[in-house]
Amino acid sequence: NFETFQKKYTLRTNLNYTSHGFHYYGLTQPDVDKDSIAQRYQLVNAQADITTNRGDTGAFNVKTTIDFRYTGTNSPSIDSLKDWKAKEHGFHINGLGSFRSGANLFYSNLGLRYNGYGYGIQDSILTLSDSGIVRKNTILDINPGIKSTLLSNKLVIDAGFKVSVDFANETRAYFFPAIYLQYAAAKNQVVPFISLSGQAKQSSLTGFYQENPFILPNLSIQNEINPYDIQLGIKGVVARKFSYGLVANFIKENNRAFFVTDTMISTGNKFTLVYDSLNHTKIEGRFGYQANKKLNIDFIARYHSYELFHEAKAWNLPQAEVIFNASYNLFDKFLVKAGLDMSFGRSAKVYGAGEGVTELNNQFVYDLGNVIDGNLTLEYRYNKRISGFVQLNNIASQRYLRFYNYPVMPISVFGGLTFKF
């Protein structure tokens, strides 16, 4: 990472590299050769942003952001098949211009997103169910708006719109509202708000891998469109230590991707994608406590309702979640973090009857069970540049199913050193 703060501009850069090797271990046959189920993802991500500092009122400021990424998988072990691997590169260029006049902030956002995904050799067939894929996708985003702060900063109105032009197999333009309204009453103790938005969500191999690394490297990738996302809620801060929030979300999700077990190419230890449209309702409540920057406590509870068009369930997604996080900072030397994640009501799609399987809408549904995952992190900061940490994951040693046929490790311990220059 690199940062520099100058009088007229601020520059930040970030470069990350990840090499993740693993096995597709979700097998029913334990005697499979490990090399045949090995995989490795290589990821490179470079980011940079520059922001002008020409003053607040009566000055035009610009923030430009550039994000580049590359993702690649291993080649098959057979030399003649070395080209049958996945490669993906993409970038996101975004420019935000703003001008403040009195209580009004005029802004316009212009963005360009590109994703190029390829697998194997284009127009070639390896097997009847495995062929070469090349998909190039570009999305142009335009988002102008006005943000006004009125009534002694109590009323905030952010009104604009967003146009996304999706250059895929067919060029399509989408129009989304971008409206936010809130009113702060009782010295910010009670802040009701409403939001109306939408988005064209660009899908990628990188994004699917980060959700589920056990996916096939050859995928049919389609973008997700959210025509609307309505939020109604209330939030506030009490006595400067306590914060709370309650919000209801109503989201229309078209072309949402779900992970299901592949039965065509793999032996059932990899996942492919099915797409469906749904109405998603989410209700979330949160509570926070902060004391003198030493103790922080956050508690979040969520409930989800999914109304799908074709699939019987929203595969792998929870119906309820409970998240608890706490941290304590002692003399800025010792930092203790504890977390607890719980998920309930997850289901997987299977293709036959069996133990734990029910039938719904002519589809077979497997109950994945509950997730109860606790973690603990201990960090010692020698100075501002050098620190060390130990992290314990799944300290309750629960062998819950992360995905179908994929139980997690009972407990894992990580440690490391951090150096800043």
Q: Which residues are covered by each model-predicted region?
A:
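Extended beta-sheet lipid-handling architectures
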Residues: 15, 66, 90, 107-110, ...
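Edge/loop elements at the starts and ends of beta-strands within beta-rich repeat scaffolds
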Residues: 6, 55-61, 100-105, 150-155, ...
